[in-house]
Amino acid sequence: MSAGDISAINIKSVKKNRRRKKRRTADVSSSDSSSSDPSSESEKEEIQNGAIEEHVGENGKSDHVFSKGNDEDKQEDIAIEVSDVELTDEESKDLKLNSKEVIDDLTKISLSKIPEPTKSQNKEGFMNASKIAENIKLAREEYNELAENFVPKGKDKTKLREEYLNLLFENYGDDINRLRAAPDFTNKSLSILADALQEGIGMFDIGELELVLKNKEMEN
């Protein structure tokens, strides 16, 4: 072989080697893309369905946790809350009636649980209060009767009143005489004066009159 033939063979072998290298790199890139495509597509789908959260584990590797359907759940919760608030007039009336019926039923149950002795005790207490009021009324009537019929020892009411009038004339006799000597003093004026003195005596009970007269006697 000549030198030209050898150089031509070398050029061909170099070209073949270059083609083999290109095929290998193409195969490697295609295998990488094929192996990475499913994961990327699945990640895209999972990202569309929910949010990706990255957590670092104990071995230092990052794990991806997918929380699916958060937005959809929130939308459902919001829809439920709105539907709970938005009630029609008829539904609100029915709700009020039902609650009232429940309260009435609970009240009936509570009343039915009251023992019978409690009811009888209340009845006895009412009867006792009425009896006490009646006894107070009777005692008051008896007291008024005793006060009206009370007579001091050795003296009656008329005599006590006369003694009290004499006591008044002794102390205020000059004033009474001046009134009687006035030019406008008449028999009518005399009766008015007598009535006034009698009413003054009525301000005291028998015991008080007796005490006043007794003190006056002790002074003399």
Curated annotation (Swiss-Prot):
Compositional bias annotation for Low complexity = 29-39
Record localization: Nucleus, Nucleolus
Q: Where is this region: Disordered?
A: 1-91
User: At what positions is Phosphothreonine found?
Assistant: 88
Indicate the transmembrane segments per the record: none
Q: What InterPro entries does UniProt report for this protein, alphabetically? A: Ribosome_Assembly_3 (IPR051898), Rsa3_C (IPR028217)
Q: Which UniProt keywords apply?
A: Nucleus, Phosphoprotein, Ribonucleoprotein, Ribosome biogenesis
Composition bias type Basic residues, residue spans: 13-24
Task: Name the domain of life.
Answer: Eukaryota
Its GO CC terms? Answer: nucleolus; nucleus; preribosome, large subunit precursor
Q: Which GO terms describe its biological process?
A: ribosomal large subunit assembly; ribosomal large subunit biogenesis
Tell me which residues bear Phosphoserine: 83, 99
- Give one Pfam hit by family name: Rsa3
Q: Indicate whether Phosphoprotein appears among the record's keywords.
A: yes
Q: Where is the composition biased (Basic and acidic residues)?
A: 41-72
**Its principal location?**
nucleus
Keyword Cell membrane part of the UniProt annotation: no
Sequence similarity:
Belongs to the RSA3 family.
Q: What else is known?
A: Present with 2940 molecules/cell in log phase SD medium.
**Complex and partners:** Associates with nucleolar pre-ribosomal particles. Interacts with DBP6. Together with DBP6, NOP8, URB1 and URB2, forms an RNA-independent complex, which is required during early maturation of nascent 60S ribosomal subunits.
Q: Which PANTHER family match?
A: RIBOSOME ASSEMBLY PROTEIN 3
Query: What function does the entry list?
Result: Required for efficient biogenesis of the 60S ribosomal subunit.
- Protein name, as recorded: Ribosome assembly protein 3
**Which organism is this entry from?**
Saccharomyces cerevisiae (strain ATCC 204508 / S288c) (Baker's yeast)
Q: What is the lineage of its organism?
A: Eukaryota, Fungi, Dikarya, Ascomycota, Saccharomycotina
What gene codes for this chain? RSA3
